[in-house]
């Protein structure tokens, strides 16, 4: 069965909840989409929304790149050659992770639909379900508590709070949530906004509450140096996010920042599933815990991440809430969320259905 056609388009999916993190405010959500059609009518879909600040490619640039791609390297090729096609895609777009991700995910979806199996079965499912956290942006205390109440009412028991501007105010927000709902598990994400002094102050102020993890407190350039300056009890909470984009980064972190033993994999950083799977294998061999995160993304790429996350025994944390505040999407399905627990649907490929 051969690839017949490739289509590219962009879509503003909107957001019902604009938010602020340490280095930007988000008020619109544009995703790039790739559809790969086979001769028998099967259509695999991929999506991406990479961050210019993190990987050097914006979604607008992704769309421009995709529209310029000569897809003759795919069209006419057998879908059973997907592994080779994935490597060709990687070689062509190594420095363009958004472009790479959209094509990579579409190939995986088309291939596993052709095989009549869910994508997770192709990888080998290791876990059935895990809780995802849901994120609260940088807000004042009243707004923070209001949003926490809303998510609690929806059944979520893992909350991630964006921080990174002021450790004292950040700590106060987190403490207030813990006091109001002590059974909730709290995570924080400083998005590179702290110095070591800031982080130590934040940890000291929050020492009486239970924090599960702290994502990327330091800038990419200082991450390894600053992690090595932390007390081991603090370093073990730190998650490498923006500092982890590819297997080379993973190996460097293992070598030079051994106190950091949680990696956050995002398909928008790795360029899709092929490279993400390599990082997951490195983590599994090294006893590193995995967290799977996202940007503001279509169900398409969120589902792709969940399929791979549930195929790794090292996966301990999910933060795959990137589609929950979208005003619309181009697909439905992909996964189920009940009381904050994420489960796959058991349908072939990504398990998504195009909205007509």
Regions found by a protein language model. Give the residues of each.
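N-terminal capping/lid subdomain adjacent to the active-site entrance of alpha/beta enzymes
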Residues: 1-186, 191-200, 205-207, 322, ...
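Short glycine/serine/threonine/alanine-rich loop segments
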Residues: 76, 117, 236, 288, ...
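Short amphipathic alpha-helical face segments that pack within enzyme cores
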Residues: 102-106, 278, 299-307
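A generic structural signal for well-ordered alpha-helical segments
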Residues: 111-112, 231, 283, 309
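Catalytic core of soluble alpha/beta enzymes
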Residues: 161, 168-301, 328-330, 337
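Active-site pocket-lining/capping segments in soluble small-molecule metabolic enzymes
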Residues: 293-334, 339, 347-349
């Amino acid at each position: 069965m051969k690839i017949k056609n490739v289509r590219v388009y962009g879509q503003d999916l909107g957001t019902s909840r604009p938010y602020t993190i340490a280095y930007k405010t988000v008020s619109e959500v544009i995703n790039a989409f790739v559809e790969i059609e086979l001769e028998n009518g099967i259509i695999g879909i991929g999506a991406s929304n990479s961050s210019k600040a993190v990987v050097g490619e914006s979604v607008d640039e992704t769309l421009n790149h995709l529209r310029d791609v000569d897809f003759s390297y795919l069209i006419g090729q057998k879908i059973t050659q997907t592994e080779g096609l994935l490597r060709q895609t990687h070689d062509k777009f190594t420095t363009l992770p958004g472009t790479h991700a959209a094509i990579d995910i579409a190939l995986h979806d088309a291939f596993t639909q052709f095989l009549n199996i869910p994508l997770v079965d192709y990888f080998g499912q290791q876990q059935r379900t895990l809780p995802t956290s849901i994120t609260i942006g940088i807000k004042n205390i009243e707004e923070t508590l209001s949003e926490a109440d809303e998510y609690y009412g929806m059944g979520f028991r893992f909350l991630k709070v964006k921080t990174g501007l002021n450790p004292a105010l950040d700590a106060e927000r987190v403490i207030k949530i813990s006091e109001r709902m002590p059974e909730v598990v709290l995570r924080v994400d400083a998005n590179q906004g702290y110095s070591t002094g800031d982080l130590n102050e934040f940890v000291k102020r929050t020492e009486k509450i239970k924090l599960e993890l702290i994502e990327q407190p330091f800038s990419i350039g200082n991450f390894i140096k600053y992690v090595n300056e932390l007390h081991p009890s603090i370093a073990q909470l730190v998650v490498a996010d923006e500092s982890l984009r590819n297997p080379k980064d993973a190996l460097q972190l293992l070598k030079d920042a051994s106190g950091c033993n949680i990696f956050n994999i995002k398909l928008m950083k790795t360029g899709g599933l092929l490279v993400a799977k390599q990082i997951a294998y490195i983590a599994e061999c090294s006893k590193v815990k995995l967290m799977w995160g996202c940007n503001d993304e279509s169900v398409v790429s969120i589902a792709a991440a969940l399929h791979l996350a549930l195929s790794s025994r090292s996966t301990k944390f999910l933060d795959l809430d990137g589609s929950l505040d979208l005003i619309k999407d181009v697909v439905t399905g992909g996964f189920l969320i009940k009381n904050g627990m994420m489960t796959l649907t058991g349908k072939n490929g990504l398990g998504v259905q195009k909205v007509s």
